[in-house]
Swiss-Prot record:
Protein name: NADH-quinone oxidoreductase subunit H
Catalytic activity: a quinone + NADH + 5 H(+)(in) = a quinol + NAD(+) + 4 H(+)(out)
Main location: membrane
Presence of keyword Cell inner membrane: yes
GO MF annotations in UniProt: NADH dehydrogenase activity; oxidoreductase activity, acting on NAD(P)H, quinone or similar compound as acceptor; quinone binding
Annotated localization: Cell inner membrane
Membrane topology field: Multi-pass membrane protein
NCBIfam families to which the protein is assigned, alphabetical: PRK06076.1-1, PRK06076.1-2
Family, per entry: Belongs to the complex I subunit 1 family.
Length: 347
């Protein structure tokens, strides 16, 4: 009697499932996970890089006790924050209190999906890339609002309100500052914007847009000197004063991920992304090298700003945005549009 085999051979079944499209999707997922992991590692390493650079500029040693020349300080910090008590106060809204750091971390990492590291390396190649970035930035505002309100602490609430007002205001200037680049390129796709700079980086025709983008980028990431939402002297660390353990770590790493993100956007929008300077053609240097060098330069500028600039008052920050940044971005956009109409009337 012959028995009909109903269950197929498992290896052959899996092999039949692994079509070309399946392998493509699997490769894309693995590549995305690797890129996100590298971004988190770079953001964590920037913490130590910042501490060592600030120590160098201030004529002191910095962290140098854990490992040779302090090389294992990052590992020690990660272990310390991982094993700290993840304490939630009784008077908080526990759901919102837990959701806030997760939203902050998720939006920061998700925004990296649009960043083209090289012609072939990146998570997604979307025509709405810049719009996706602003969508994630808009959602990120809720993270600090949730954290400030759910903590049931007056310092947290004031820090959350400050952060929301500052972020929403400077996101307007951030968007207007790069509209000149979008007008020159005719695309919201970052890969197309980088490729359009093959004949010249946009830092020259969009210099004032770049300056406004730098200021707005620092304000949106809540970095010094625009760190009023976390002002230690006034608000005792602001909206995350009640956080500890990994929840605080997610807020902390999320801030540095945003610094890397804004630095990468500056590289792509104004400095040619992965393109070599002066159209140099050096075969043994991959395009991703130029992208990383430019991004590291802007990350260093964030550190330099922290070590050299004083923190203005909150009202001065808001006045500077609406009375200086907004007019500059609007004038830059109008001049860019006029130049395009005069020299390219068919567009």
């Amino acid at each position: 009697m012959q028995v009909t085999r109903i269950i197929p051979d498992v290896p052959s079944f899996l092999a039949s499932m692994m079509t070309f499209d399946t392998w493509s999707i699997l490769f894309m997922v693995v590549q995305s996970l690797v890129i996100f992991l590298v971004v988190v590692i770079v953001a964590a390493m920037m913490i130590i890089y910042e501490r060592r650079m600030l120590a160098l500029w201030q004529d002191r040693y910095g962290p140098n006790r854990v490992g040779p020349f302090g090389s294992l300080q990052l590992v020690a910090d990660m272990l310390k924050i991982f094993f700290k008590e993840d304490w939630t106060p009784n008077f908080t809204d526990k759901f919102m209190f837990t959701l806030a750091p997760a939203v902050a971390m998720f939006t920061a990492l998700a925004s990296f999906a649009i960043i083209p590291i090289s012609p072939t390396l990146g998570v997604a190649d979307w025509d709405i890339g810049i719009l996706f970035f602003f969508a994630m930035a808009g959602i990120a505002v809720y993270a600090v609002l949730f954290g400030g309100w759910a903590s049931a602490n007056k310092f947290s609430l004031l820090g959350g309100l400050r952060s929301a007002a500052q972020t929403i205001s400077y996101e307007v200037f951030l968007g207007l500052s790069l509209m000149g680049v979008v007008a020159l390129t005719g695309s919201f796709n970052l890969r197309a914007i980088v490729e359009a700079q093959a004949d010249g980086w946009y830092i020259i025709p969009q210099f004032f847009g770049f300056l406004t983008f730098v200021v707005a980028g620092v304000a949106v990431t809540h970095r010094h000197p625009f760190d009023q939402p976390e002002a230690e002297q006034e608000l005792a660390e602001g909206y995350h004063v009640e956080y500890s353990g990994m929840k605080f770590g997610m807020f902390f790493i999320g801030e540095y991920v945003n610094v890397v993100l804004i630095s990468a956007l500056m590289t792509c929008l104004f400095f040619g992304g992965w393109l070599a300077p002066f159209n140099l053609d050096i075969p043994f240097i991959p395009p991703a090298f130029w992208f990383m060098i430019k991004t590291l330069f802007f990350m260093t500028m964030f550190v330099l700003a922290r070590g050299s600039l004083m923190r203005p008052r909150y009202d001065q920050v808001m006045n500077f945005g609406w009375k200086v940044c907004l007019p500059v971005t609007l004038i830059n956009l109008l001049v860019t549009a006029a130049v395009i109409l005069i020299f390219s009337p068919t567009l």
